[in-house]
Amino acid sequence: MNVLEKEILFIISRLRCLTENQFNKLYNYKRDSKKKTLRKTLRRMCNDYILVKFPCNINYRGYKENSYLYYINGSCEYYEGDDLIKTLIGSDVAVRLKLANFEMVRFYRNINIGEHNYNLYIEYIDNFYIIKSICW
C-alpha cells in the first residue's frame, strides 16, 4: 500500500465518505497526469474491495455534486436522502478547513450538546492557535 492509499484511507475513516471532487480539491491536482494517478488509485482501491463507489447527483440550495461518492467497504452506515446531504456538506466544510491549514480537533455529526441538537459540529484550531467551532 503506497502513501496516497494510506492518506485516502485515513481521510475517509475520519469523514466517513468523500466525493471525487473533494479528493481533487484536497490534493490540489491541476495537471491531468496527477488527476489520472488519483483516479487510477481510487479505481484500484475499489477493485481490491477497499472502497465502495456510488454515483452521486445532488442539487441542494446551490450545493451541487455530480461525481462519485466513496465509502470504506464494510462500513456500517451508507447515507441516503437528507443524511447524505448533511454528510457531504460536512465533508466539504472539513476539506475546506484542511485546505486553509486549520487543525481539526473534533468532527461530529448528529450530536447533542446541552439542550441543543446539531447536525454538524466541527471544532478546529486556526492559524493563531485559537479554538473555534462550527455548529449547524
Question: Which residues does each PLM region occupy?
Answer:
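Nuclease-adjacent, charged terminal/linker segments that flank catalytic cores
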Residues: 1-78
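Short, Lys/Arg-enriched charge-dense amphipathic segments
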Residues: 45-48, 77-85, 124-135
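Solvent-exposed, charged helical/coil patches
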Residues: 64-111
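Short, surface-exposed, charge-dense and proline/glycine-enriched linear segments
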Residues: 53-56, 85-90, 133-136
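Active-site metal-binding core of divalent-cation-utilizing nuclease and nuclease-like domains
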Residues: 96-136
